[in-house]
Amino acid sequence: MSGIKTYIISNKDRRPDRYADVVEQFSNKTEFDVQITQCVFLDDNRRYGLWLSMMNCIADAKKNAYEKCILVEDDAYFTDYYNENTFLQYVNYCESVGYDILHGGIYGTSNPIRNAYNKGLWDIAWCWSTHFIVVYNKCYDKLLNYKFELHSDVADGVLNKLGLKRAVMYPFMVLQKDYGYTDITFHTVGHMAEMLRDTNKVFEVNLRTLN
């Protein structure tokens, strides 16, 4: 059986370190059918460039009638919690019950709700992060038809606005390597770790209330 169509959005010429790292991450994982996709680089509006890159992938997935696809940014890496069988179980479950998007990991959310049938999945109303998302075909058109606000929108903010049915795996199976910048922002090294600590605390608090 072939793997899930997986689009890795990267720019080999501008970011050879990130390109090499992310290719290595997927090198031995046959559950993914990897396609390297050239990112749309707009130096004056990187937010829009990322969105266009993502929509190019979604358009290709729709054209090829893929029931689902995975979008990956080139700073993504698999954590020690990643397990192929568990990952595929989550992906198939979310597809069977009508989710729009499944996140491999996030930075920032509030009030996640643990799934009653899959305790490693949590429903979320909003989050920050698009570095690894499973996108199901039921929301392809909603994403493709969205009119991106050039002066205010960011990709993860758009997903928050659209009211999609979303879940995240926790513990997180895929996170972002901190290069000191993302596709749309520059920041101090260590900022990602701080955001991750804060996000983990949100889940830890919710776990304590369940125990």
Residue spans of the language-model regions?
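An acidic/histidine-cluster motif and surrounding catalytic segment
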Residues: 1-72, 76-211
